[in-house]
Swiss-Prot record:
Protein name: Urease subunit gamma
Family: Belongs to the urease gamma subunit family.
Gene responsible for this protein: ureA
SUPFAM superfamilies in alphabetical order: Urease, gamma-subunit
Localization of this protein: Cytoplasm
Organism whose genome encodes this protein: Mesorhizobium japonicum (strain LMG 29417 / CECT 9101 / MAFF 303099)
Length: 100
């Protein structure tokens, strides 16, 4: 199987999001990369489903809560920017203050 670098990145993010979900199920607080992966995966999958950019920007800020991350992680993440593929092309989605 030959994957482009972009496809490899998407698979890595999807796998990291799976690991993060399993850790949340066990009650383990997420670290920085895990929180980013969950938010990114949510946006990418929402884009593939055809959800509008504005909706993903708003909903992406409710994927991970302060109670689900390690101390100080929420303050470290100011914005999450995701280049996602929508039915009408690739767009940049920015989730401001993604952990509330």
């Amino acid at each position: 199987m030959n994957l482009t670098p972009r496809e490899k990145d998407k698979l890595l993010i999807a796998m990291a999001a799976i690991v993060a979900r399993k850790r949340l199920e066990r009650g383990v607080k997420l670290n920085h990369p895990e929180a980013i992966a969950l938010i990114t995966d949510f946006v990418v999958e929402g884009a593939r489903d055809g959800r509008p950019v504005a909706e993903l920007m708003e909903a992406g800020a409710h994927v991970v809560t302060r109670a689900q991350v390690m101390q100080g992680i929420a303050e470290m993440i100011h914005d999450v920017q995701v280049e996602a593929t929508f039915p009408d092309g690739t767009k940049l989605v920015t989730v401001h203050a993604p952990i509330r």
